[in-house]
Structures are given as structure tokens and as C-alpha cells.
């Protein structure tokens, strides 16, 4: 097997140093690791051989740049392979998102939104037994949205249902769903739906 380890000084003033924070898979749990195909494994080994060959070359003013670029190339391939893995695990990912939706529904029904506390990435990741970074990447890959954006739309759908039900005023909907004020809720609703909450209720009845 292979182990790649490098000193942080290698990152200084390099493209890898500027981009290392973008490789979110460094924060994944062990059970979220890559499952490489044979072709992907060959490509990863090729990258490692290139790094090894450069390390065996006499050190000169280009060594640091070339080694860091080879490492960055390997990490870029890993990003590509993770995208492939997300695609091939489509059904598994859908099941995970269904569990997330159930958890978010429960969070809304619990009344915690009244205190203005929105569900966090860690909250959802813990329920799903995932690392926060893996959960965020999965959600972004499947929906194109981060948790705040996704929950914003989900909360809006719940607001629509409440407006069409009996016993809820616009004010009570805004309060139950944790919006900071009725005016904020009304303005946001109009922006996203195209009509005010009252107009929406009238148009559907």
C-alpha cells in the first residue's frame, strides 16, 4: 500500500496551499472513504509514482513546485472519483436524504424554531451518522443547495400547508416556523412565491 505524508511548509506559496481547504474529503469519516475502481486505482498509483520519482530527483529550485503540483493532481483526481461515487450511490443517497427530511419535519414539529434556532449541519449529520463535511457535500451534490438554502425552501413548503389549513394566522405561522417577524416572513414569502401569504391563501381557497 501507499501512504502520502508531507510537511505543512510544502504548502507555503503554492497552488496546493491555496486550495488545500477545498478538499473537504479530508474531514470525512473512515466509513465514507473512496471505493476505487481498477482504473481509478491505476491512476492514483500513477500519481504516487510521479511523486516518488520527483522525490528521487536531485533537489533544485523546481522540486517544491513540482512535488506540490503532483500532490494537487492526485487530490483533484480524488475529487473526481468522489463525484463518481456520489453518482453510483444515487439510491443510497436518496435514502439518506429521505431520512434527513423526516428529521427536519420532526424538528419543525418540535417547536424549536420558535426560539429562532435552526437545525445545524452537525445536527443533521449526527442523526444520519455522517461526518458534517460528507453530509454537506452529499446534500450539495444531490440538491445543489447547502443546508440553509434547503431548509429555507422546506420551511416555506410547511408555511404553505399551514396557510391552507384552519386555525393559523399569518402571524402564528411566522412565529411557529421561527421567522424573526411577520414582515420578514411576508416579504420572503412574496419574494419566493410571487404573492403575499394572504394572497396565497385566498388563491388556493
Where would I find each of the regions flagged by the language model?
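DNA-binding recognition helix and immediately preceding turn/loop
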Residues: 96-148, 166-175
Amino acid at each position: 500500500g501507499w501512504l502520502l505524508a508531507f510537511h505543512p511548509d510544502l504548502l507555503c506559496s503554492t497552488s496546493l496551499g491555496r486550495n488545500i481547504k477545498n478538499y473537504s474529503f479530508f474531514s470525512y469519516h473512515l466509513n465514507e472513504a473512496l471505493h476505487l475502481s481498477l482504473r481509478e486505482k491505476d491512476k492514483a498509483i500513477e500519481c504516487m509514482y510521479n511523486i516518488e520519482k520527483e522525490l528521487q530527483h536531485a533537489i533544485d529550485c523546481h522540486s517544491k513546485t513540482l512535488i506540490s503540483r503532483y500532490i494537487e493532481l492526485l487530490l483533484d483526481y480524488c475529487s473526481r472519483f468522489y463525484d463518481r461515487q456520489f453518482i453510483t450511490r444515487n439510491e443510497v443517497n436518496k435514502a439518506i436524504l429521505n431520512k434527513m427530511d423526516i428529521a427536519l419535519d420532526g424538528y419543525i414539529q418540535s417547536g424549536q424554531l420558535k426560539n429562532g434556532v435552526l437545525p445545524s449541519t452537525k445536527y443533521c449529520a449526527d442523526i444520519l451518522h455522517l461526518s458534517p463535511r460528507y453530509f454537506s457535500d452529499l446534500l450539495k451534490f444531490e440538491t445543489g443547495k447547502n443546508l440553509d438554502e434547503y431548509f429555507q425552501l422546506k420551511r416555506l413548503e410547511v408555511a404553505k400547508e399551514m396557510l391552507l389549513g384552519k386555525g393559523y394566522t399569518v402571524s402564528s405561522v411566522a412565529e411557529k416556523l421561527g421567522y424573526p417577524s411577520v414582515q420578514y416572513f411576508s416579504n420572503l414569502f412574496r419574494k419566493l412565491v410571487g404573492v403575499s401569504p394572504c394572497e396565497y391563501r385566498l388563491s388556493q381557497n
